[in-house]
Amino acid sequence: MLKGFKEFLARGNIVDLAVAVVIGTAFTALVTKFTDSIITPLINRIGVNAQSDVGILRIGIGGGQTIDLNVLLSAAINFFLIAFAVYFLVVLPYNTLRKKGEVEQPGDTQVVLLTEIRDLLAQTNGDSPGRHGGRGTPSPTDGPRASTESQ
């Protein structure tokens, strides 16, 4: 049981996921501190009345209490900064590398041979039109039969 768990943890996907979570958590903390220390104070100063310290995004509701929309706006900016960075620094490069790495796989030889057998059987049993190798069916492009029919 312990061996199976060790193999599960040693797989590449699990290790990659663990690294991504650690880096993502650290990056989130960095962006949150940036937003809290730089963006939020700038947003707090938008439309502030010098006498009451209540502005466009901080609405006084009486009794010295306010509805502070600055916190919500800061959280939204925080989210969009993280989403932007993750998309352009992780997702986009990963997708381009994955597309470059995709190589067209040659057809499975067993499938090619079975297709040729099916076509031969259809021809010997009578010309049936359609998928089963009738008169309108083109010659195979792969496999042993393709080289003999092209000669």
From Swiss-Prot:
Residues 1-14, 90-151 are cytoplasmic. The chain crosses the membrane at residues 15-43, 69-89. Keywords: Cell membrane, Ion channel, Ion transport, Membrane, Transmembrane, Transmembrane helix, Transport. Residues 122-151 are annotated as: Disordered. Its main location: membrane. Gene3D superfamilies: 1.20.5.220, Large-conductance mechanosensitive channel, MscL, domain 1. It comes from the Bacteria. GO terms for molecular function: gated channel activity; identical protein binding; mechanosensitive monoatomic ion channel activity. SUPFAM superfamilies: Gated mechanosensitive channel (SSF81330). InterPro entries: Mechanosensitive_channel_CS, MS_channel, MSC/AndL, MscL_channel. E.coli inner membranes are often used to measure the activity of heterologously expressed channels, but the lipid composition of E.coli membranes differs considerably from that of M.tuberculosis. Phosphatidylinositol is one of the major constituents of M.tuberculosis membranes, but not of E.coli membranes, and this affects channel activity. Channel that opens in response to stretch forces in the membrane lipid bilayer. The force required to trigger channel opening depends on the nature of the membrane lipids; the presence of phosphatidylinositol enhances mechanosensitivity of the channel. May participate in the regulation of osmotic pressure changes within the cell. Homopentamer. HAMAP family: MscL. This is Large-conductance mechanosensitive channel.
